[in-house]
Amino acid sequence: MGCVSSKQFKRAAQHEDPAILAKETTFSVSEVEALFELFKKISHSIFRDGLIHKEEFQLALFRNSNKKNLFANRIFDLFDLKRNGVIDFGEFVRSLSIFHPETPLGDKIAFAFRLYDLRGTGCIEREELHEMVLALLNESDLFLSEEAVEQIVDQTFKQADLNDDGKIDPDEWKTFASKNPALLKNMTLPYLKDITMVFPSFILNSEVCEEEL
């Protein structure tokens, strides 16, 4: 099969121009092109339609498309900016940009808040935090007693709920997260800064074979 130059990326792949995505995110053009290779692998793992479905997202995270996990579901829902049940390439790049090492801390804090705000009410309630703690433990294959989980929730609210109204608002979350940077360690993926090293340079420089699109 023939090959197309990176200038034909948008037309051939029917995805947004890498230059536009680079301008709107922390990624460079070459990093966006490298992410397209990753996007293709994920979006063709099950349905092969050029879109990432929840099962493919689960498979990429856990090597298991049937594993139920609130954490993975929340990440998928936040990546699905158009709320249509799938993730296209533009959504993939824009959302993944949050995890870039050079993305401002404030953006990471805001994303983490939305992650924990399960009901979308604009605040984090005790039940939501409890559910997310359990999900994160499950994702890490860790087990804590219910009493230990409640202690984590209690301590978090004791430190974060400054006005003691039983919920954590965005400003309280920002203050709490700024004082507890370990809370955001999962909001940074160091390899994204070196994503261009993952794939062959000839792919990044100019060519993507049509048979892979």
From Swiss-Prot:
Its main location: membrane. Pfam families: EF-hand_5 (PF13202), EF-hand_7 (PF13499). InterPro entries: CNBL1-10, EF-hand-dom_pair, EF_Hand_1_Ca_BS, EF_hand_dom. Coiled coil: none annotated. It comes from the Eukaryota. The record marks 140 as: Involved in dimerization. Ca(2+) binds at residues 161, 163, 165, 167, 172. Residues 31-66, 67-102, 104-139, 148-183 form the EF-hand domain. Keywords: Calcium, Cell membrane, Lipoprotein, Membrane, Metal-binding, Myristate, Repeat. A lipid is attached at residue 2 (N-myristoyl glycine). One of its GO terms (biological process) is calcium-mediated signaling. Expressed at low levels in roots, shoots, culms, leaves and young spikelets. The keyword Cell membrane applies. It is found in: Cell membrane. Belongs to the calcineurin regulatory subunit family. Homodimer. Acts as a calcium sensor. May function as positive regulator of salt stress responses. CBL proteins interact with CIPK serine-threonine protein kinases. Binding of a CBL protein to the regulatory NAF domain of a CIPK protein lead to the activation of the kinase in a calcium-dependent manner. This is Calcineurin B-like protein 8.
